[in-house]
C-alpha cells in the first residue's frame, strides 16, 4: 500500500499548499509552496543517476497498488503521486524510450483531443522533466494554470498565417514563446515542425529545449 499511501497523503496535502497570486498588471503569476514536490523537482537527472536507478515510469517497476489506465497500445494514464493540482496525471509510454517530442507528437495530439477537459503538457529532457529517460506527458485540469486563460490576451499580430492556421509570438507576460492556432491536427503538425526545425539544438542535447502546453477546443 506504499504507493497508495504516498498518493493519498500528497493529494490530501494539497489542501494545505500555500498559493499566492501576483498581479503583474494585465497578467498574473501564481506561486505555490508545495513541499511534497521536492521529491520530483529535486530528482537527479544526470546520466550517472539515471543509470543507477530503476525507472519509476516503467510498468514493471510500478508498485502493484498503482492503478493504471491503458491508453491505446502505447501509453498508460497514472495518477501523479506527487501532484501540483487536484487532478494531475502522468502519461508515460509503456516502452522505455527517451523523452523526445517528435516520435510521440501524434500521440500528444490524440491525447489532448481525447482528454479535452484537460491541458496536456510536455517538458523536454533538459527542460524540467524529472524522467528524461522515459517518454511521458502530464495532464492537469484546464484553466488551473493562469496561462490557459490569459494566452489570448497576448497574441495579436501573427508571424505566419495560412487560412485559419496561425503562429503567434507570445510576449508581454514574462513567459515568452510561440502559440500555434490550428484548425486541424495536420496543420498543427506542419506548423510545429517548422518551428522545431528553426530552433537551436545545444551541443550534446537531443532536441531543442522546450516546454509545450496543448489544449483542444
Predicted regions located by residue number:
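Short, small-residue-biased leader/transition segments that mark boundaries at the very start
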Residues: 2-5, 217
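Low-complexity, highly charged intrinsically disordered N-terminal segments
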Residues: 15-71
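Nucleotide/phosphate-binding site architecture used for ATP/NTP-dependent chemistry
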Residues: 49-76, 105-106, 162, 185-189, ...
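Catalytic metal-binding acidic patch
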Residues: 93, 133-140
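Conserved His + Asp/Glu catalytic blocks
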Residues: 100, 111-131, 140-215
